[in-house]
């Protein structure tokens, strides 16, 4: 069985599923390339192009016209890489057996934040190869779920909601406790997993404020 982790604020572009089927083999995970409005900095792993941030302003017709132009035409979709790259970010497609083999998502991070980085690390340690196809894409409005959702008390689409900030802090501390470091990846979103050592600090005259600062 093939499954996919997919965000609610993503729009599947033509040919995306065909590209997944082309590249998905045993012990691989295939990510689609994200086309995003410029809410976050640009990077070598995605395409910045503004076709709307909110569903109500989504310019679907303009997006499809831009995307379906020949790749060598002026003003159309231009992949940043000629060949698939090695990285992982939503949406990602995988075989159900590979997901079950590592126990799925760790409930430590429920309801959200850092659960994706955690499972990416575990996939990599279990021998999974990551493939990002540049022939298959999604349009990603970004942060329309909870992070910058004004319905969830975010002041605007450029500021994180209080609920997301609090949960992100909890999940970040749990990630550091589990892995011994903060989330790390290369410029193309392939996980970097440093070695973890059994170390500790002995404190004298301790208090809760100091413990909170030193122990994640």
Residue ranges of predicted features:
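Short beta-strand-to-loop acidic/aromatic patch adjacent to the donor-nucleotide binding site
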Residues: 2-11
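Histidine-centered active-site/metal-ligand motif
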Residues: 7, 140-142
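A short, conserved beta-strand element in the Rossmann-like catalytic core
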Residues: 10-12, 37, 110, 118
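Conserved donor-nucleotide/metal-binding helix-loop-beta segment in metal-dependent transferases, i.e.
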Residues: 15-32
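Alpha-helical elements of Rossmann-like donor-binding domains used by nucleotide-donor carbohydrate transfer enzymes
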Residues: 15-19, 118-122, 170, 174
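A short, conserved alpha-helix in the catalytic core of glycosyltransferases
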Residues: 20, 86-94, 98-103, 109-137
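C-terminal, non-catalytic tails of nucleotide-sugar-dependent glycosyltransferases
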Residues: 29-84, 90-93, 129-130, 146-212, ...
